[in-house]
Amino acid sequence: MRYTISEMASLLGVTTHTLRYYEKMGLIHPEVNEDTGYRYYTVTDTRRFNLCRELRAAELSLEECRELIGAPTVEQSDAMFNHQIAQLRRRQVLDELAIRFLEHKREQYRTLEQNAGRIWVQNFPEMWRLTFSQEEAADRDKELQQEKAEWLECMPATRWVSRLPRRVMEQFRVGRNEYDYGLMIEADAARRLGLKRTKHVEVVCGGDYLTTIWKKDYRGSFGWDSLDDLHAEIVQCGFRAVGETFSSIVASREQPDGSIVNYHLTRTKIYT
């Protein structure tokens, strides 16, 4: 059985453009009538084409497909399959973490207004942190920028989080409200995703944090008012010591007058 390009496209449910592209890539090799220039395809071509489609559905590249239907050694095919299996398993982890993120985000949106301004103690797991800016001025270190790119590929498991040093709460309203900006991820998730704990990565201790949702309804930089409620609670409770403070956006809403309100989860490490 021989097919014209139109017949093969109809049979396989693809366009003639796709078949021409696969031929150009060396994935299929139709017979060419030297007199007419017409291309004719056989069952050999349909089977090779469909094998490539299956491999593409598993997210192998066309270049990898070409190698796999060429003459790879067992070592070469093993390497390509193992690499893709590892990539898909990592994707599974990312998908699982993304689902968990969305479930948590759904609950945050449900309770947003009732938690705004409320203060509670919440236990957080150990985290990894990659810091790459002092306030909003980014560090230009090339190694750090490469790590930043790798971490950004892991969103939403990685989150953008501001960090304030412990002296901000210990010397409240003295000097500037300083912070650095970076990405954070649960330590267990980082290990599952294969992120490396390099010299740029810090470990943020888990445990109890005094927590609130703060509403920022102005466009300027963060002021001391963002910490007023937490600091008042710290003073009232008389904790033995406090650690660093972390803040990340959890929601944003546009108001009837067009102004924007951002909701920030802000937490301070406490030692009781």
Language model feature labels by segment:
Residues Y41-T42, V74, R253:
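Short Asp/Glu-rich motifs
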